[in-house]
Amino acid sequence: MEAAGFLYYSPDPQGRQQKQHGHHGHFLAQPNAAYTISASPQLLAPTPIHFPSQLVLGGRGVPLTITPSASPSLMEPYRDMCSESATTDLLFNPATPPLTHSAVSTPSLSYAMPTPISNHGWSSEEPVIATVSLSDIHLPSTPADYFPPGLVAPSILKSNASPPPSISLNDLHCPALSPCSSQDSFNESDCCDPRELTIQSPTPVEIKPDILFPPMASLSGDDDQFLFGGNVESFLPLASKVTPYMAGDYNEELSDLGDSEDDFIQNFSESVFSNKRMRFDDDSENEQLPSPPMSTSSSRQGSVAPIKVLKRKLLKVKKEDTPEEMSEEQRLRSFKFGSIDSACSSEPSSPCSEKHSHMVGHPISPHVIRRGRKQSLTEDPSKTFVCHLCTRRFRRQEHLKRHFRSLHTEDKPFACGECGKKFSRSDNLTQHSRIHGTGAVVLGVLTEGEVPVLGSQFMEDESMHSPQPFIVVDSMTAASGEIKDKSSDDKKSRKKRKRSDE
């Protein structure tokens, strides 16, 4: 019998044959006398791989061909997959590593593995079965040899490569596909026995005693000892040092401080506080509040005594400085009410003498901090209209009336035609009229005939303050009228002289 070639499996590294034939490798024939192929090839009956498709209607398999049964079956008959041909197993890719040619002699024990010869896959009508012995299977010496020639093995696998183990017949029965390390390299120390695992007890925590801080000073005047050089004893609980409380001592100490409060109280009338034009600049002064009650121990009394002396000295110094450092508003108030008291003192029977008898004031030069536009504080003799209450001077009578209404009488003769709100000044009314969207405002313009009427109204409103507040104003208006008449006569005479000269 002639020597027939045998087949060996070589993978396709580029994967070109995979697209054409559906598998990874191809088989090539090589001459070898050790393997023979039977002259009469074993023919296998071609078995259809795919069964004819059936039309699915309503989830049931209905055959396309006519069956001898009267009606189609209700359910598709169960098909056992194990009863099919063994050729369907060839549809899956082999799980063995790539095989290479080996010159190992044929062993006594060999196994036959059916492999088709045709490169066209499973469509061959007469497949040829070839036998490959297990001795031809060459395991790679290192894990890096597992990779095809086109790929590069990682450097880790190359560095950790070990010599191939010896293969025995008993090992061939086991599908061991990767080299395993020898059992001699097994180290018992690498394993961990769970019985030897023990939980270490935590280290005991040392409990330190709490740090004893000195007690805080209470709010009952204990801070005076530390601030003003009192006797400071060792830090002990306050209960051992505090003496029983005496109600009489508390009242006595408050009575000592009560004298200092009277120095800071200013007895102003209610009209001063209700005046919207006045300002009080007393916020800068420090409020003198009474200290909290203190205990009656001898050491504390010695430390508190110099405090009261210092307070009284400070109050005396402030009393001496108040006339010089008096603000402009306070001077205005003292001058205003001082002039009223002086006017009332001339007439003891007037009702205002009783009303302002409790107020004491002295006339001071009227230096006033004015609000709004900046005005001259010097006494201008050209301002002929003088207010008899605050002795302010004005150039026009309208200015004096406006000042008198806004500050002294608070009369509001100007009323809004839309909402009826009243104002003491006409400019305030014009500004208010812009809210309603109308620029035109009807103002009651005063004529010469209406001056006495307004004067009589002011006299009625101010009758309780002064007997005749507008006597000076009326005399001034008469004098100013005479001056105006004289100036007009002089102008006319000058014109006549010019005409006569011509």
UniProtKB/Swiss-Prot annotation:
Compartment annotation: Nucleus
MF terms in GO: DNA-binding transcription factor activity; RNA polymerase II cis-regulatory region sequence-specific DNA binding; zinc ion binding
Example of a GO cellular component annotation carried by this entry: nucleus
Function: Key downstream transcription factor in the HOG1-MAPK pathway. Plays crucial roles in the regulation of growth, conidiation, trap development and fatty acid metabolism. Negatively regulates secondary metabolism such as arthrobotrisins biosynthesis.Also regulates autophagy and endocytosis.
Deletion phenotype: Leads to significantly enlarged and swollen the hyphae, with an increase in septa and a significant decrease in nuclei. Remarkably decreases spore yield, spore germination rate, traps, and nematode predation efficiency. Increases the expression of the arthrobotrisins biosynthesis cluster.
Chief location of this protein within or outside the cell: nucleus
Keyword hit for Zinc: yes
Species this protein is from: Arthrobotrys oligospora (strain ATCC 24927 / CBS 115.81 / DSM 1491)
Keywords, in A-Z order: DNA-binding, Metal-binding, Nucleus, Repeat, Transcription, Transcription regulation, Virulence, Zinc, Zinc-finger
Record lineage: Eukaryota, Fungi, Dikarya, Ascomycota, Pezizomycotina
A single GO BP: regulation of transcription by RNA polymerase II
Zinc finger (C2H2-type): 385-408, 414-436
PANTHER family: C2H2-TYPE DOMAIN-CONTAINING PROTEIN-RELATED, ZINC FINGER PROTEIN
UniProt name for this protein: C2H2-type transcription factor MSN2
